[in-house]
């Protein structure tokens, strides 16, 4: 039985997230259906994370097992003929039998995009969060820096989600403006449910003057979700980089 890893990219507007849901279109469901048509047997696809409804992926890693002998380099072309235009497989390769797209992942980067202009741009609908009031990226960077390090991130996750631990390590959180677009890039060893979007909302809170950047440390210590900023809309969020280095596999997506 072969274990095959896939690199894919998708525009998530038309999907109810990654994970399979009954009677709803999801990326996992769509991908599994396409793979089954190519390899001629049902498959279960493991993804590197559960992106929410409307969230996009510039690069996403998944893996599945198959008895098919089709060469891995031919798989992207075969799969893409059965996939809709908003999901594209860019690479396929054989991996160790113990490789797991989520369990083997060491770090992930998400990028949140804000369209910061007084006028909307129709080409960024569902691709960036339109925010008409001017945001000072220097204040945003000062706020973002407060998240870097190992902390309990319970204050920036969805209330009611059940996990063993809410402690995570954030390696960097960078804010960059390019014209009317503001990019918030955050890398961590893992993300809680809605954590990246709640962090972005808290950074915007600081730029709005609703909290001081240095208060973010206190908010994290409190674990109080209501003290942090809002969970910003999903359309501005992209999975943008993944790192694998667990002794089983060592690669990055994108390469």
Where are the predicted features?
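Structured-RNA-binding interfaces characteristic of tRNA pseudouridine synthases
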Residues: 1-255
